[in-house]
Amino acid sequence: MNKALKIVVLAKQVPDTRNVGKDAMTPEGTVNRAALPAIFNPEDLNALELALRLKEQRPGSTVHILTMGPFRAADIIREAMFRGADGGYLLTDRKFAGSDTLATSYALSCALRKVGYDLIVAGRQAIDGDTAQVGPQVAEKLGLPQITYVEEIERAEGDSLVIRRRLEHGTEVVECPMPAVITVNSSAPAVRPKNARRVMKYKYAMIPTEIAAEPDSERARMVAAHDYLKITELTVADIDTDENQLGFAGSPTKVKKVDNVVFQAKEAKRLTGADADINELMVELIASHTLG
């Protein structure tokens, strides 16, 4: 009989990088999150969907979100709960500020040891960095097997998974033992919509910091009455870490500048479609090394 699984989805609240302005970076080389609207990282939504599908295959399984960020990152935990997740953990502390992928993966791996897991699922990469490093780094730090570029979990039997992954020129089906880390592509199934009943049920979910800010609110009273509305908040004090590996101190990478690049044509040439025009275009493209 297949046992129930504790599935942890690594997710990130990211700035919407589709409209990056001059205020996108701080002088210290970190993202100015206050200057950009925040969204659920797209491929992490694909990861959430695969986790929820696996939960449905294994009765009794749970899906929890683990995200590292400021207090407002609790929003994506609530969003995940609206879609089917059971709860979440917000890893938040000023000591995490300035973390690159190395420091982030270290903090996440320490938190994962604290909360426990049978399977860790993450999006391939975050749109505010495009490194695709955090998932593999977490696997390395935890000593777990990793499967990247995943687009489907075909079977989950016993303590192993059969996974289809997307490669450059096709797909590959592999078997992997659990516990493991898998990172999920955008080619995986799109996340399911929010469920209206779950929205009504979990809209009151809060972290302790939010409760402390409004202790007499209706939301705070609802959380006090229902444990399932309590989102766990973890700080450096709650996990076993070497603080020299956190935040700025643990981050060898610094971003100097981010620009929104828009390519504009300086001139345009209209072609009639005649053979002579096409031949002339081919000569120009070859001469400019665009072709050939």
Residue ranges of each PLM-predicted region?
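N-terminal glycine-rich FAD/FM-binding segment characteristic of electron-transfer flavoproteins
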Residues: M1-G292
